[in-house]
Amino acid sequence: MATKFPKFSQGLAEDPTTRRIWYGIATAHDFESHDGMTEESLYQKIFASHFGQLAIIFLWTSGNLFHVAWQGNFEQWGQDPLHVRPIAHAIWDPHFGQPAVEAFTRGGAAGPVNISYSGVYQWWYTIGMRSSNDLYTGALFLLVGAAILLFAGWLHLQPKFQPSLSWFKNAESRLNHHLAGLFGVSSLAWTGHLVHVAIPESRGQHVGWDNFLTTLPHPAGLAPFFNGNWSVYAQNPDSASHLFGTSTGAGTAILTFLGGFHPQTQSLWLTDMAHHHLAIAVVFILAGHMYRTNFGIGHSMREILEAHRAPSGRLGLGHKGLFDTVNNSLHFQLGLALASLGVITSLVAQHMYSLPPYAFMAQDFTTMSALYTHHQYIAGFIMTGAFAHGAIFFIRDYDPIQNEGNVLARMLEHKEALISHLSWVTLFLGFHTLGLYVHNDVMLAFGTPEKQILIEPVFAQWIQASHGKALYGFDVLLSSADSPATSASQSIWLPGWLDAINSSSNSLFLTIGPGDFLVHHAIALGLHTTTLILVKGALDARGSKLMPDKKDFGYSFPCDGPGRGGTCDISAWDAFYLAVFWMLNTIGWTTFYWHWKHLALWQGNAAQFNESSTYLMGWLRDYLWLNSSQLINGYNPFGMNSLSVWAWMFLFGHLVWATGFMFLISWRGYWQELIETLAWAHERTPLANLVRWKDKPVALSIVQARLVGLAHFSVGYVFTYAAFVIASTSGKFG
């Protein structure tokens, strides 16, 4: 007899209802809960799956390179990056009429194409790619890499090649190899690529597989390196009149500290970036030799943590017991990794626009908007995931005896203070921010705009001034000619930095006023509310006054009922579910702010943002409504244009989003009644009743219905705003 899905759970496979299918899907990746799973097997399966993950990433990137090389216009774009629109790939659609064919035939293409808003053209150009052949070579290399990784994944599932549990638990060796190898050597390799390939290409000298071993990246060769005269590599940098990709105005330096941006490309100097990666490589390769392994020298993580005890005694036993707690809990490790990755992803969003690393990207406004929005949303989802796995750790892996008296136990012991403080902060921020906005709305509605409460962000302006922004007239640190900070850096990076920070042609330290002050606090409200829900969910995951035995019910449970009132909606999963709504809310406000501020600056109309952002109607009318008008009228009986696909996606996104509410508002009983009625009708309908099923139809649990609702809400939300950002920006700037 064929075994039924799911093979990993005998109990579910024997369930006579459709629960078998839905719970099977829901627990497919919860490896810990699978039949016969041992700790060693769990680690081995996860380890092997990493190779598959990397293979998928390589395959995807290979596909990007291949399609641009085959159907794109990379070489034409390289001739004139500011005026040629980069093509992502061709479109073949049997539904296209002649108007659509004409509308989507752009960028010098022969037929309909999609425009690239991902920044890959700028990235590939910056790192030294110039021809479609370069792209094909990269695609082929990644394809081979993906095949090798798939083989490695298969290999590590074979008994002879499965690492042992002790290998996975060897934290010091892993740290050394990841720090020195993963971060250090890869940064060194990237420095090598920048110095040997990207910098010469930026100066009009081609370097390829045919000549990279014979082309010196610097006229002096390696002599200055060996005789300690390293400053030679920083002499004669590219001049301010350098034309990127040509020898006009080019220098010979390879490792510099110029500061600021290349005047033509408005991106960071390639030689500065090479220097940065070299420094990172040195630091991480050193760090990768710090931990004690076979040779009995270096740090022991366990000893460091055991020794971490506050002299005052106010932190109890400090970090005692944390080494084993972290090292034996995959959820703890995943939580830490996701929290770090979430922060880094948000920093990427921030730095990608304020310090653009890729040539000509800063002048491609739609790409800048898309990349900021994309990375902030990704960061939001990753950060909520960090707290989800933190909560699962507390339920499944936390050992109260092993952690008695240490900082982790003390976190749990004073959780009421943490949660109530977060609650106080959110109430304060919410009432005051909304109060200011609403007051200003009322003043405008009553015809007295001069009675608005407008607060200058003086502290933030002071911080900007201390970094060298002269506009506000604060005479402090880098904005003061007499400051030691100014004189110390005068001969190296400071002139380039000061030029950049005081220039109106980039997004470095934008001028801020009362509108920024208000939206900053609105975003702070969103961040603190999201944090409150997530922190409360994790700290109450093991139990609360209302439900002291909560941990016995697992991570996600609908209720302990009937008969035990108030236990619905308090699982740690429910906290995650609620937090995602607030996270989306917050990222929405953040991206609205970024996008509107930049639209105003790019259009040379900063006053629009400054005047309209101080009251809510301004946001609704002058940002959302004004910029969605093209989308709302994107296609009609009289015709369509190249924005019509975004107009349709805008509509479709709203529909997906609205579908979410159907699952969020109606609960299990409604669906059970509906399903039973539909099953009755199906069995009595000719032809339809030829299709039978053995499983008794059972509605999803409340938790699963909430998941379906949340998924639709999130996907619809993201689709709607993606279409809005791309269409409203590309509609104005091309």
Swiss-Prot record:
- List the membrane topology term(s): Multi-pass membrane protein
Q: Keywords, A to Z?
A: 4Fe-4S, Chlorophyll, Chloroplast, Chromophore, Electron transport, Iron, Iron-sulfur, Magnesium, Membrane, Metal-binding, Oxidoreductase, Photosynthesis, Photosystem I, Plastid, Thylakoid, Transmembrane, Transmembrane helix, Transport
Query: Where in the cell?
Result: Plastid, Chloroplast thylakoid membrane
EC annotation from Swiss-Prot or TrEMBL: 1.97.1.12
Q: Which domain of life is it from?
A: Eukaryota
Q: Name where it mostly resides.
A: plastid
Q: Where does chlorophyll a B1 bind?
A: H654
Catalytic activity of the protein? reduced [plastocyanin] + hnu + oxidized [2Fe-2S]-[ferredoxin] = oxidized [plastocyanin] + reduced [2Fe-2S]-[ferredoxin]
Per the record, a Pfam family?
A: PsaA_PsaB
Q: Where does phylloquinone bind?
A: W671
What class does this enzyme belong to in the EC scheme? oxidoreductase
Any one GO MF annotation of this record: 4 iron, 4 sulfur cluster binding
Q: Where are the transmembrane segments?
A: 46-69, 135-158, 175-199, 273-291, 330-353, 369-395, 417-439, 517-535, 575-596, 643-665, 707-727
What residue stretch is flagged as signal peptide? none
Could you tell me what the cofactor note in this record states? P700 is a chlorophyll a/chlorophyll a' dimer, A0 is one or more chlorophyll a, A1 is one or both phylloquinones and FX is a shared 4Fe-4S iron-sulfur center.
Which positions bind [4Fe-4S] cluster? C559, C568
Instruction: Tell me which residues bind chlorophyll a B3.
Output: M662, Y670
What GO terms in the biological process aspect are recorded for it?
photosynthesis
Any single Gene Ontology cellular-component annotation: chloroplast thylakoid membrane
Q: Which HAMAP family match?
A: PSI_PsaB
The annotated subunit structure for this chain is: The PsaA/B heterodimer binds the P700 chlorophyll special pair and subsequent electron acceptors. PSI consists of a core antenna complex that captures photons, and an electron transfer chain that converts photonic excitation into a charge separation. The eukaryotic PSI reaction center is composed of at least 11 subunits.
Summarizing the function annotation, the protein's role is: PsaA and PsaB bind P700, the primary electron donor of photosystem I (PSI), as well as the electron acceptors A0, A1 and FX. PSI is a plastocyanin/cytochrome c6-ferredoxin oxidoreductase, converting photonic excitation into a charge separation, which transfers an electron from the donor P700 chlorophyll pair to the spectroscopically characterized acceptors A0, A1, FX, FA and FB in turn. Oxidized P700 is reduced on the lumenal side of the thylakoid membrane by plastocyanin or cytochrome c6.
What PANTHER family does this protein's entry cite? OUTER MEMBRANE PROTEIN, OMPA-RELATED, PHOTOSYSTEM I P700 CHLOROPHYLL A APOPROTEIN A1-RELATED
Assigned protein family: Belongs to the PsaA/PsaB family.
Q: Mind telling me what this protein is named?
A: Photosystem I P700 chlorophyll a apoprotein A2
